[in-house]
A protein has these predicted regions:
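Sec-dependent bacterial lipoprotein signal peptides
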Residues: 1-21
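Short, aromatic- and cysteine-enriched interfacial helices/patches
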Residues: 1-4, 28, 52
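A broad structural signal for short, well-ordered beta-strand segments within beta-sheet-rich domains
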Residues: 7-10, 33, 59-64
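Bacterial signal peptide processing site
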Residues: 23-26
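Post-signal peptide N-terminal segment of mature Sec-exported envelope proteins
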Residues: 32-49
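Post-signal-peptide N-terminal segment of Sec-exported extracytoplasmic proteins
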Residues: 44-75
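Extracytosolic low-complexity repeat regions of secreted or lipid-anchored proteins
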Residues: 77-145
Length: 145
């Protein structure tokens, strides 16, 4: 009986060590996600301006900043996130938009606007054409290594 209990304890210690060792800090963090969303969003705004026939602006002129938080299950890792994006519109006024994100374990995400702040999935260009709203839903990936 003593030998069996000792073996069982040893097995439990090994299993616990393996499980804990495999559960290191996730590479998916708020900072990494924010650093991925900011340039992606800025580049999409720059392209959107062109599609709408508005005066061109460089992506860096939009001064995009993001603030992200995981909605469930801790502060890091794959799953559902929310990000607030602040950026300078063409008039120089600060605009704020909220996005719901789903982030996968490989660092890829899909961002969908909360509400219709940015005009819905289709916008009217200056010449009357319908154009896809690139800011309504967008995807991106970041390095998790």
């Amino acid at each position: 009986m003593f030998h069996r209990t000792t073996v069982l304890r040893a097995v439990l210690v090994i299993i616990t060590t393996v499980v804990i060792g495999g559960c290191g800090q996730s590479p998916i963090t708020p900072v990494r996600l924010e650093n991925a969303i900011e340039p992606t969003f800025a580049n999409l705004v720059e392209l959107q301006m062109s599609w709408l026939g508005l005066p061109p602006m460089a992506a860096s002129d939009f001064g995009v900043t993001a603030s992200c938080r995981k909605l469930t299950g801790g502060k890091t890792g794959a799953g559902e996130w929310a990000c607030n994006v602040a950026w300078l519109g063409p008039s120089g006024r600060t605009l704020r938009d909220g996005y719901d994100l789903f982030v996968t374990t490989d660092g890829c995400y899909t961002a969908t606007i909360e509400g219709n702040n940015l005009g819905g999935p289709i916008l009217k260009a200056a010449d009357g054409r319908d154009v896809r709203n690139l800011l309504f839903t967008f995807e991106g990936c970041f390095d998790t290594t």
